[in-house]
Amino acid sequence: MTTKRNAIIATALLMGLTGAGSAWAHGNVVPQAVETKGLTPIKDTNLPLDADGWAAQNPYRNSPERDKAVEIGASAYNQNCAACHGLEAKSGGIAPDLRMLDAAEAGDEWFVERVRHGAVRDGRVYMPKMADYLSQEALWAVRTYLDSVHVEE
């Protein structure tokens, strides 16, 4: 009887530890490469760039490449963002619902800040510095996709 009881306790403990590992895994997603063929490189746009070569606003929002950017952005989002922010940008509560991000240029500044610098609180990474892993073209494609699924609060 004691052996059976110990086995049950050990199983419950193991299951609890497995679940705890999943809870702490937020933010530990390995970024996946994004193919941006079909999008004009940022440096070739006529937008003003900052000292680091970053555009302050989305170069694809009103361009003929918008639909291609949405397509690439949707794929990039699913590969790199959905694990935390939810499928179709519908958050399950772990991270912000990105459909609510200010649409158009109003949200570009916040977007650039987050993807370039991430978010760290109390030494814990809540949002990785995605600009360390993905090209600016890929990240602006994600932003274009997010604009396409935007909803008002």
Residue ranges and their predicted role:
Residues M1-T3, V70, A74, W140:
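Short alpha-helical segments used as structural interaction elements across diverse proteins
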Residues T2-I8, A12-K68, Y145-E153:
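Post-cleavage N-terminal segment of exported redox proteins
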Residues G19, E88, D102-E105:
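Residues at alpha-helix boundaries and short interhelical turns
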Residues G27-A33, R99-V151:
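Extracytoplasmic electron-transfer domains, predominantly the class I c-type cytochrome c fold
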Residues D50-A55, R66-E88, W110-H117:
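Sequence/structural segment immediately N-terminal to covalent heme-attachment motifs in c-type
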Residues A89-G92, G123:
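Short amphipathic alpha-helical interaction/hinge segments
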Residues G93-L98:
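Short cysteine/histidine-rich zinc-coordinating motifs and their immediately flanking basic loops
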